[in-house]
Amino acid sequence: MRTVNSIRLFVLIVTLTLSTHVSNAQKIKPKNVLKDMERVADWQIEHFRDTFSIEYSKAHHIADWTNGALYVGMVKWAELAKSDKYYDWLKSVGEEQNWNLHWRPYHADDHTIGQMYIELFRKYGDSTMIAKTITGMDYIIDNPSEQPITLDKYKHLERWTWCDALFMAPPVLAKLSIITGDDKYTRFMMKEYQASTEHLFDIEENLYYRDNSYIGKLDQGNKIFWSRGNGWVFGGLTIIMEEYDEGSKEYNYFLEIYKKMAAKLIDIQTPKGHWAMSLLAQDLYPTPETSGTAFFTFGLAWGINKGILNKATYEPSVRKGWNALTSYISEDGMLGYVQPIGAAPGSAWADRTEVYGTGAFLAAGSEVYVLYGGK
C-alpha cells in the first residue's frame, strides 16, 4: 500500500510540475477564474472538519486564526458566487461560535474571525454579529498591554510581535473604526502597527522579518524573509487600505509600505510563478508554496485594479502567479503545496493543504477575476 501511495504522489507531482510550465503563458479568462474558485471553495467546505496538519490530532477550532483566514477569502467568494450557500455557511459558523472571538483577549490570532463577522454585519445589518467583537477590541484599547514589541521566543504575544499578526488584528480595528465612526480603533491600530513595522521591516529589502529571532540571522548567506509571513502583511495591507479614504494620513502610511513591497515582490518571483518559501533564497527552497503566492497575487491584482500599480509592469507577475496557483489544484478541488503551520521557510507537498491557503486563494481569485474583465 505504501508503494502504491508513493507512486500516486510521484505521478501527482510530475503532472503538476509539467502543467505549471505550460500554464504560465495561458490567458486568464474570468469564467475560468470563477470555476476554479468554486471548485476550491466547495472542496474546502466539504472537508472543513478534516485534520490537515500532521502535528495536530484534531481539526482546527472554528474560531482559530487558520479558519479566520479562510473566512476572509470565503467572504470574497460569496460576493461573487451566484448561490447564497456560501453566505449561509459563513453565518452558520458565526452562529455556532455565538459570534465570539476566540479565547485569548490580546492575541491577534484570536481576533481574525472578527473580520468575517464585520463583513456579515455589513451585508445583513444584524448588530449581534459584531457586538462581542466591539467589546473585545474596546477591552484591549482601554487596557493596553505593557509587554515589549519583541516576541522573544513566544514570551510576548499580547502585542503584534510577529508579522503574521498584521493580517489578523489590524483589519478588524480598521473596519470597526469605519462602521462605528469612532477613530479610537484607528488610533490604536496605527500606534501598534507602526511599532511592529519599526521593529520588523527591513528598509534595505523592503520586506518584513517574521519576528525578532530572524533579525540578523542568515541562511547560507541569505537574510531570512518567510514568504507566507510577508504574504500576511501584504494581503493585510490591501484589506486595511480599503477602509480609508485615498489621501488620508492612514491610507498614505500603508500605501508607502505597500508600494515598496510590491516593487520588491515582482523582482523576486520565481520563473515558475510562485514565490520561494524563503523569498531571497530560491535555490535553497525550490518547492512551490501556494499560501504566500496567493497572498502576493491577491495584493498585486488589487493594486492594479485600484490604479495604484502600473498594469504593464505588474500584470505579468499576477498572471504567472495565478496560473501557477491553479496548476496546483487537484482534480477534486484541493489546493496543494500549502506549507503547513509554521514560522519560517520549510516544506510543502502536492497532496497537502491548509485552510488558510484556501482563504488566500479565494482572495486572490476575487481580484484576478476583476483584473481580467469579470463583472
Protein language model annotation of sequence segments:
Residues 1-28:
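Bacterial Sec-dependent N-terminal signal peptides
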Residues 14-16, 24, 69, 168, ...:
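Generic detector of isolated residues embedded in canonical secondary-structure elements
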Residues 26, 31-68, 80-87, 96, ...:
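CBM-like carbohydrate-recognition segments
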Residues 87-91, 99-212, 332:
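Extended ligand-binding groove/face enriched in aromatic
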Residues 148-156, 278-282, 339-340:
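Acidic interhelical loop/turn segments
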Residues 163-167, 174-279, 286-297, 309-338, ...:
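Extended ligand-binding clefts on enzyme/binding-domain cores
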